[in-house]
Amino acid sequence: MIQHPRIGIRPTIDGRRQGVRESLEVQTMNMAKSVADLISSTLKYPDGEPVECVISPSTIGRVPEAAASHELFKKSNVCATITVTPCWCYGSETMDMSPDIPHAIWGFNGTERPGAVYLAAVLASHAQKGIPAFGIYGRDVQEASDTAIPEDVKEKLLRYARAALATGLMRDTAYLSMGSVSMGIGGSIVNPDFFQEYLGMRNESVDMTEFTRRMDRGIYDPEEFERAMVWVKEHIKEGVDRNREDLILSKEEKEKQWEFVIKMFMIGRDLMVGNPRLAELGFEEEAVGHHALVAGFQGQRQWTDHFPNGDFMETFLNTQFDWNGIRKPFVFATENDSLNGVSMLFNYLLTNTPQIFADVRTYWSPEAVKRVTGHTLEGCAAAGFLHLINSGSCTLDGTGQATRDGKPVMKPFWELDESEVQAMLENTDFPPANREYFRGGGFSTRFLTKGDMPVTMVRLNLLKGVGPVLQIAEGYTLELPEDVHHTLDNRTDPGWPTTWFAPRLTGKGAFKSVYDVMNNWGANHGAITYGHIGADLITLASMLRIPVNMHNVPEEDIFRPKNWSLFGTEDLESADYRACQLLGPLHK
């Protein structure tokens, strides 16, 4: 059984015996326990289990104790460390020198002992040795007897832990390409060096004929297939067929296509993570899967010109339920856009929520909306908005039909209930695919995302000579008047899932206007997650050494390793590029 990645907590202490160290043992170890309790009681793994922490076997005052802690962490699948101390310690003697995992240090802000002095000293050693570390120092002085973790310290500890866990969850997993390059899209030209060096992942690949092989040879669970057919007939609403009359399939042909796309879903899932049921059926090799944390399906055009498209498969892999019940989502990219798949993966690992994959299709200015519909935009939409619409697939969680405190949300699967599942299904239909584009047919997904949800749109791009760069745009989904929505939606493809998105403007750079956001977006796709998580993404990017070229996160929320400030404090964007370039990828 594969262990969850864990956070290692390192209580460091003044090594002087005969009174000094002894007086600090309890306080120092209690700091470590408090941090472990905070993380385990607040954060969860994608499977819903509490995040696990490992505390060093003793306080760390000298090198042998640092070495003992290091050995324990190696055996315990520790993916990141947090060092805590209320006092002076011996900097380079007590630091963790593992170069391939993130590190953070919390120095207690008190007057009795110089925790802040150790923090500064050990961070200087980290910078000198080229091993980045995040510095955490409370804004307010605390009493030595105060065991509470201040709110500003909590925020940084949790931000660090979320991002660090994401690095650990990605390590030693795979990206699975089902097919190859789709329609010349750059993101589907999969770059194995990026995955290996920045994410610690490997690349797997299967030809799309693997789907037809498994169908023809019965390499799927026939009992599950029958159960799925019953569920689909009961719960899935087939939408309006908008095809030309000569392209409309007969009822019998559509029935066959439903069977086909259900099998596609089952096979796509089994390819990613395996299925022990296949071994029982005599298919031991296929039963193991590809250990894929994220995958993509080429589809267009070689597959979709002949077979039903991947929309149903992609939709339900990214959704948190199917005929087997509520479960965690998969991360699955349309058109094998691996870079958007990774963007979705970053979002997912930071939030444990499903992801919207969308084309960044159209910028609608207030003037254009007024001209076309007669409607004057107000509120969040007053400066215009972006039409996010994928060509046929999207997680059903993207409907916004789940709620928390009466507001629409996208939330982890363990919070989802059956009434919310039914609401998602009732607010979605599955029209036959547009056969001018998808000659082989299939069924697209059609819904409208509810408005007033805080969301973050993300995109990873590869820049020759630089490497990966990340873009982040926080904003809100919009709910337009029904007639305005239909007028605008019908100008594209009303059989596809739509999200209206207004990024939050800052008045400068790429966020001077909504037009500038669209104009500076690096690719045709974006990954959209629930919540404003730009600060977490910036922290994660710094751990992976990926510079952020565009974001609208307030400066006070940016949390990067301390040595980033040594690359400059006035122009943080340029300092980020220089730090990432000098340090190089996390796993190189």
From Swiss-Prot:
It comes from the Bacteria. Its EC number is 5.3.1.25. It comes from Streptococcus pneumoniae (strain Taiwan19F-14). Mn(2+) binds at E335, D359, H525. This is L-fucose isomerase. GO terms for cellular component: cytoplasm. Converts the aldose L-fucose into the corresponding ketose L-fuculose. Keywords: Carbohydrate metabolism, Cytoplasm, Fucose metabolism, Isomerase, Manganese, Metal-binding. GO terms for biological process: D-arabinose catabolic process; L-fucose catabolic process. It is an enzyme of class 5 (isomerase). Pathway: Carbohydrate degradation; L-fucose degradation; L-lactaldehyde and glycerone phosphate from L-fucose: step 1/3. Belongs to the L-fucose isomerase family. It is found in: Cytoplasm. The lineage of its organism: Bacteria, Bacillati, Bacillota, Bacilli, Lactobacillales. It holds the Pfam family Fucose_iso_N2. CDD domains: L-fucose_isomerase. Signal peptide: none annotated. Its cofactor is Mn(2+). It catalyses: L-fucose = L-fuculose. Its main location: cytoplasm. The active site is at E335 (proton acceptor), D359 (proton acceptor).
